[in-house]
C-alpha cells in the first residue's frame, strides 16, 4: 500500500488523485492522507512573509516520520533548496503554464486604467506593473472558488489565477472576461510533482514509471535558474524552458524585476532528453546572467 500525502484543497486532491490513478493503473494499491499545511492555515499574509515551504513543510515531516510514503505537490511550491533527505521522484506532464487575468463583465479597462488587481504572487505583481502601471495590487489568498467569489463581489476589479488550476478543477469562467497574460510563469508552474525520501529505493523505482521525462528536464532547468539567482518565492522571477525533442534542443527564457527594472536573459543547449546535467548547466548560466 502506497500512502499518498496531500493538502486538502480541491485542487490538491485533484492532483493527488491523478497520481493515485497512475499508480493504480500500474497495479499498486494506494491510499490518500490529507495533511494541513501552514499555507492552508495562514490566509491573511503574503506567502513571501510566511516563510519557505509554506505548502510543503508538514508533508515533508510526515514523509520523514514514515507517516506517508510520497507527497504530491505543485512543483512550484517546493523550495529549490530543500531537505537533503527528500527528492522529486517524478513529475507529470506539464499542464498550461499560463497566468490568466480574470475580470467581471461589467468592468471596462485598458493599460492606463487605475484598477485593483488581486494576487498573492510577488512575480505577478512585479511583472504586471509593466503592463498596467497605474494598477493597485491587493492581497488575494484562498482557493480558486473563494478568489472568484471575491472578484464577483467586487472586492477587486481583476484577479490573476493559473490556467492549469482552472483546467484541473473544470471551473467555468463564463460569467467573467479573461485573457492569457504575456508574462513568464513561475519556474515549474503547471507541473504536478511527487516527492519521496532520497533513501527509499523501492519508491524511487516505482515513481520512475510515472515520470514525464521532457517535463522533468524543463522543470529542472527552470528551477536551477531560480536557485542560481537566489531568493526563492520572495523574488519576482519568471522562467520557461521548452525542449524540442525532434531537434534535441533545450531553450530557456527567464526574467526578474529588481529596483523596478525588468531584466531578461535566454539561452539554449543541444541535449538528449535524459541529459539532465546539461539542463542544470543551462539553468545555472541563465540564473547567473540575471544575477550579475
Curated annotation (Swiss-Prot):
Cofactor binding note: Binds 1 dipyrromethane group covalently.
InterPro entries given in the database record: HemC (IPR000860), Porphobilin_deaminase_cofac_BS (IPR022419), Porphobilin_deaminase_N (IPR022417), Porphobilinogen_deaminase_C (IPR022418), Porphobilinogen_deaminase_C_sf (IPR036803)
Pathway note: Porphyrin-containing compound metabolism; protoporphyrin-IX biosynthesis; coproporphyrinogen-III from 5-aminolevulinate: step 2/4
Reaction catalyzed: 4 porphobilinogen + H2O = hydroxymethylbilane + 4 NH4(+)
GO biological process, one term: heme biosynthetic process
Endoplasmic reticulum as UniProt keyword: no
Domain of life from the UniProt record: Archaea
GO CC annotations, alphabetized: cytoplasm
UniProt record similarity statement: Belongs to the HMBS family.
Note: The porphobilinogen subunits are added to the dipyrromethane group.
NCBIfam families (alphabetical): hemC
Protein name: Probable porphobilinogen deaminase
Source organism of this protein record: Methanocaldococcus jannaschii (strain ATCC 43067 / DSM 2661 / JAL-1 / JCM 10045 / NBRC 100440) (Methanococcus jannaschii)
The encoding gene: hemC
Amino acid at each position: 500500500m502506497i500512502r499518498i500525502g496531500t493538502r486538502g484543497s480541491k485542487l490538491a486532491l485533484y492532483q493527488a488523485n491523478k497520481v493515485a490513478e497512475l499508480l493504480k493503473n500500474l497495479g499498486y494499491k494506494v491510499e490518500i492522507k490529507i495533511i494541513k499545511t501552514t499555507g492552508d492555515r495562514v490566509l491573511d499574509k503574503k506567502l513571501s512573509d510566511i516563510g519557505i515551504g509554506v505548502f510543503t513543510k508538514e508533508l515533508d515531516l510526515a514523509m520523514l516520520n514514515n507517516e506517508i510514503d510520497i507527497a504530491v505537490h505543485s512543483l512550484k511550491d517546493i523550495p529549490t533548496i530543500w531537505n537533503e533527505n527528500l527528492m522529486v521522484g517524478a513529475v507529470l506532464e506539464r499542464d498550461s503554464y499560463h497566468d490568466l487575468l480574470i475580470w467581471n463583465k461589467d468592468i471596462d479597462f485598458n493599460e492606463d486604467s487605475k484598477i485593483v488587481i488581486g494576487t498573492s504572487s510577488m512575480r505577478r505583481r512585479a511583472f504586471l506593473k509593466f503592463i498596467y502601471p497605474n494598477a493597485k495590487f491587493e492581497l488575494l489568498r484562498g482557493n480558486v472558488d473563494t478568489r472568484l467569489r471575491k472578484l464577483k463581489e467586487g472586492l477587486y476589479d481583476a484577479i490573476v489565477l493559473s490556467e492549469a488550476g482552472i483546467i484541473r478543477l473544470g471551473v467555468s469562467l463564463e460569467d467573467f472576461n479573461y485573457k492569457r497574460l504575456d508574462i513568464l510563469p513561475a519556474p515549474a508552474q503547471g507541473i504536478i510533482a511527487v516527492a519521496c525520501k532520497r533513501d527509499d529505493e523501492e519508491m524511487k523505482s516505482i515513481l520512475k514509471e510515472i515520470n514525464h521525462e521532457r517535463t522533468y528536464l524543463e522543470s529542472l532547468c527552470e528551477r536551477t535558474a531560480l536557485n542560481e539567482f537566489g531568493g526563492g518565492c520572495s523574488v519576482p522571477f519568471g522562467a520557461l524552458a521548452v525542449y524540442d525533442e525532434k531537434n534535441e534542443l533545450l531553450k530557456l527564457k527567464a526574467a526578474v524585476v529588481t529596483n523596478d527594472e525588468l531584466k531578461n536573459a535566454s539561452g539554449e543547449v543541444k541535449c538528449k532528453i535524459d541529459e539532465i546535467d546539461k539542463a542544470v548547466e543551462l539553468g545555472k548560466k541563465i540564473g547567473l546572467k540575471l544575477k550579475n
